[in-house]
Amino acid sequence: LQQIQDYLSSFCFGDTYTRKTLNLQDREMLTLCAIASLGGCEPQLKAHIQGNVNVGNTKGILLEALTQCLPYIGFPRTLNALGCLSQVLPDKK
């Protein structure tokens, strides 16, 4: 298992995330949308929601990005992603 985790980290966060054309905010948002489209990846989705916040994307931007995915990934996956968004970034009271 450790060997797979090491490979995943070096490939995704080394080779892929260090490319120069996209900025980190756009790259993290695209990653979030891709994971949302897969379904069944809620732990990874939550991690990338927090990752988006860490690089400066707001809840509003993420809400808009996931809404944009709706016609392409369907209601169930979009609603699951929005549920994860609400869990990681609950509405302020």
Residue ranges and their predicted role:
Residues 41-48, 69-84:
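Short amphipathic alpha-helical segments at helix boundaries and their inter-helical linkers
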Residues 36, 50-55, 64, 68-71, ...:
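Short basic/hydrophobic patches in alpha-helices and adjacent helix-turn junctions
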Residues 20, 33-39, 52:
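Short, glycine/charged-rich beta-strand-loop motifs at protein surfaces that mediate ligand recognition
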Residues 1-24, 54, 76-93:
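Acidic, glycine/proline-rich low-complexity segments that act as flexible tails and inter-domain linkers
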Residues 26-36, 45, 62-69:
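Short, structured motif recognition centered on aromatic/hydrophobic residues
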